Amino acid sequence: MDYDYIIVGGGSAGCALANRLSEQKKNKVLLLEAGKSSHPLSRLPISFAMLVDNPSANWRYRSEPEEGTSNRQIPVPRGKLLGGSSSINGLLYICLLYTS
């Protein structure tokens, strides 16, 4: 099958882009995501802690050891399901102060 657009990564931006491109009926859009289409725990705000160390929902990346962290590796959660990291962040967001 032929596609006009192939989007790799079904995170927030990839999904938004695929949606926007597919609004034009002539466009054939393929959205690729390595993980599952969803995870039951991703819909419950309190359960994000269970997804952070779950290999089916998180790539489980770690930072490189650095002097400033006493040579520790710090977990860097990255979502591995449709919606990407937004699906494992516990539905949290940060609002800046108006004065910022």
Which sequence ranges carry the predicted segments?
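Beta1/beta-strand and adjacent pyrophosphate-binding region of the FAD-binding site
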Residues: M1-G11
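N-terminal Rossmann-fold NAD(P) dinucleotide-binding loop
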Residues: G14
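Aromatic pocket-lining residues of Rossmann-like dinucleotide-binding sites
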Residues: L21
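Short beta-strand "acidic-cap" motif of Rossmann-like dinucleotide-binding folds
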Residues: K28-E33
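N-terminal FAD cofactor-binding segment of flavoenzymes
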Residues: A34-P77
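FAD-binding core of FAD-dependent oxidoreductases
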Residues: L81-N89
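Glycine-rich FAD cofactor-binding loop and adjacent beta-loop-alpha segment at the N-terminus
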Residues: L91-C95
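Conserved small/polar residues in nucleotide/adenosyl-binding loops
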Residues: Y98-T99
